[in-house]
Amino acid sequence: MYRSAVFLLAALFGLCLASAPAFAAVEISFYSRELGGNNFPHAFIYLKGQPDSGGPPIDKSFGFTVKSLSPAVLMGPVGGKVMNEPDSYVAKSVRQFTFRLTDEQYGAVLATIEEWSNKPQPSYSLNKANCVHFVGKVAQAAGLRVEFRKELMKKPRSFLLAVKALNAEVLARSGTTPAAIGTNLPQSRP
């Protein structure tokens, strides 16, 4: 009798767990890459997880860059594109901060990425629409305060550190632990 009751309770508990919604969330990470070797300074984001409301999971980076590198970028607007950074590039970059997005914030981030993907060409401007501007607009879509200070718009790391400082309380409340802020990830994806 006792075994039957235990089995029945275990089965009911299992059914409750199976019918409960799974906890899922999309995390956004903001990365920078410094000048060195063949690398230009760069900023990009990484999205990983699944929306709480369901939908397909995401595990992808997004950065804004020139379509073709040439001296023309120094003279004025050139063709620009949103691209996915290779895993090897992500692994050699510095994650400045990560936090969980609500489904609403996630939708706004995706809309911003889509907007920048469909900008009329030429869309990249070193002074008005570069990778730092892109991650700044994504950060705003994610609900962060952003100051587009001219002296930081060509300095990805400094810009992201300024965004992190402006939003320290928000980042702490939304799941970023102090130890995770500004640390590198292992060689695998975030």
Model-derived segments and spans:
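Activation targets extended, charge/polar-rich intrinsically disordered C-terminal tails
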Residues: 26, 111-190
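Stable alpha-helical elements in mature extracytoplasmic
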Residues: 40-43, 93, 97, 105-112, ...
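Short hydrophobic/aromatic-rich motifs at helix boundaries and adjacent loops
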Residues: 81-85, 103-109
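Bacterial N-terminal signal peptides
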Residues: 8-18
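Glycine-rich catalytic cores of cysteine/serine-nucleophile enzymes that process amide/ester linkages
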Residues: 25-95
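Second-shell loop/turn segments in exported
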Residues: 31-35, 93-102, 117-125
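Bacterial N-terminal signal peptides that target proteins for export
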Residues: 1-9
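Sec/Tat signal peptide C-region and signal peptidase I cleavage site
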Residues: 18-24
